[in-house]
C-alpha cells in the first residue's frame, strides 16, 4: 500500500509541479516516473542494501531517489537543472543519506565525488532513469573511468537498451554492444510503457542491468584502438568486413590483398559482416593487425 509520501504518483507529481511552477525542458529530456511499482522493480533488480552506495543521474523531483534512500546506505545524485534543486531539497528533506550535486554528469568529477561521499560503502551501484538524449555518453563515461562501480540498473530508450544487450548476429548488435559487453554482463529487467512517465516520452523504454566484470571479456593493450577497430566493421552494415576495412585504413584500397591476408590469418572470413563477429573475434583481429604495419588509420 502506498503511503502519501511517495512522489511517484500522478497527483503528488502534479502538486509539486504546481507548487514550484515547474515546466519541463524538452532539451534536458525530462520525463518523470509516476508509477511506484516500476520503481520497486528497479530497486529489486538493483540488489541494494544498507551497505550499498548509489549513484543516480537525473533525479528529477526525487521519485526514484526517495526509494533509493530508504534502501541504500548513501545516495549521490547528479542533477543538471538548477530549477530542481529546491524541489529536491524539499522532497528529500526526510533523508540524511542523500547528497544532490547540481552538475552535468558528463563534466563532473565523479571519481572525487564518489571518494568524498560513498567511501564507506561496500559496493556501488548506478541506478537511474537516464536522460535519453545522452544515455550512451553517460554510460561510456562511467565505464571508462577508474571508478569502483559494481553495476548499473538503468532505464533508457528501448532501442538503445536492446543494442546494449544484443546478441551476435542480431539486428541490434553493433559497436555499442561490444563496448558495453566488454566491461559488463548485460541483461534485460523489464519493458516500461510510456504511460508511467510525466510527460510521456515519444519512445518506449526499457530497464537493463549491467554488472561489471571482474576482468574485461578480452585482454587488449589499448582499449580505445580496439574499440575503433571494432566500430569500423559496422561502418556500413550491409558491407563485408573486407569492404569496411578497405574504407577504414589509410590507403586501404591499395592494400586489398594485405587486408585479406590479415583477416584470414586471424581466422576470419573476409566475406563476413561485422554483426557476425564476437568480441573475441575482434580481439584476434586487433592482435593480428600488429603484424601488418601497412594497415594504418
Swiss-Prot record:
CDD domains: AdoMet_MTases. It catalyses: adenosine(1518)/adenosine(1519) in 16S rRNA + 4 S-adenosyl-L-methionine = N(6)-dimethyladenosine(1518)/N(6)-dimethyladenosine(1519) in 16S rRNA + 4 S-adenosyl-L-homocysteine + 4 H(+). The keyword rRNA processing applies. It is found in: Cytoplasm. GO terms for cellular component: cytosol. PROSITE patterns: RRNA_A_DIMETH, SAM_RNA_A_N6_MT. GO terms for molecular function: 16S rRNA (adenine(1518)-N(6)/adenine(1519)-N(6))-dimethyltransferase activity; RNA binding. Keywords: Cytoplasm, Methyltransferase, RNA-binding, rRNA processing, S-adenosyl-L-methionine, Transferase. S-adenosyl-L-methionine binds at residues 31, 33, 58, 79, 104, 129. PANTHER family: DIMETHYLADENOSINE TRANSFERASE, DIMETHYLADENOSINE TRANSFERASE-RELATED. This is Ribosomal RNA small subunit methyltransferase A. It comes from Staphylococcus aureus (strain MRSA252).
Amino acid at each position: 500500500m502506498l503511503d502519501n509520501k511517495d512522489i511517484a504518483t500522478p497527483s503528488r507529481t502534479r502538486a509539486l509541479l504546481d507548487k514550484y511552477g515547474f515546466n519541463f525542458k524538452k532539451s534536458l529530456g525530462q520525463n518523470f516516473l509516476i508509477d511506484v511499482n516500476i520503481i520497486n522493480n528497479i530497486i529489486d533488480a538493483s540488489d541494494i542494501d544498507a551497505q550499498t552506495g548509489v549513484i543516480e543521474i537525473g533525479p528529477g523531483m526525487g521519485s526514484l531517489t526517495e526509494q533509493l534512500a530508504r534502501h541504500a546506505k548513501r545516495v549521490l545524485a547528479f542533477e543538471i537543472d538548477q530549477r530542481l534543486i529546491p524541489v529536491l531539497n524539499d522532497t528529500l528533506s526526510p533523508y540524511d543519506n542523500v547528497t544532490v550535486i547540481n552538475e552535468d554528469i558528463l563534466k563532473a568529477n565523479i571519481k572525487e565525488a564518489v571518494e568524498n561521499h560513498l567511501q564507506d560503502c561496500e559496493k556501488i551501484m548506478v541506478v537511474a532513469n537516464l536522460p535519453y538524449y545522452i544515455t550512451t555518453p553517460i554510460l561510456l563515461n562511467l565505464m571508462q573511468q577508474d571508478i569502483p562501480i559494481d553495476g548499473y540498473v538503468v532505464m533508457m530508450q528501448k532501442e538503445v537498451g536492446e543494442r546494449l544487450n544484443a546478441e551476435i548476429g542480431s539486428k541490434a548488435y553493433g559497436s555499442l554492444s561490444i563496448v558495453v559487453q566488454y566491461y559488463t554482463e548485460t541483461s534485460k529487467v523489464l519493458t516500461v510503457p510510456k504511460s508511467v512517465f510525466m510527460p510521456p516520452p515519444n519512445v518506449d523504454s526499457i530497464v537493463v542491468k549491467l554488472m561489471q566484470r571482474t576482468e574485461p571479456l578480452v585482454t587488449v593493450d589499448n582499449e580505445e584502438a580496439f574499440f575503433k577497430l571494432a566500430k569500423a566493421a559496422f561502418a556500413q552494415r550491409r558491407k563485408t568486413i573486407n569492404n569496411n576495412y578497405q574504407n577504414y585504413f589509410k590507403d586501404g584500397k591499395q592494400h586489398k590483398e594485405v587486408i585479406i591476408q590479415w583477416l584470414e590469418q586471424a581466422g576470419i572470413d573476409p566475406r563476413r559482416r561485422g554483426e557476425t563477429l564476437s568480441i573475441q573475434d575482434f580481439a584476434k583481429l586487433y592482435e593480428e593487425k600488429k603484424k601488418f604495419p601497412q594497415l594504418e588509420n
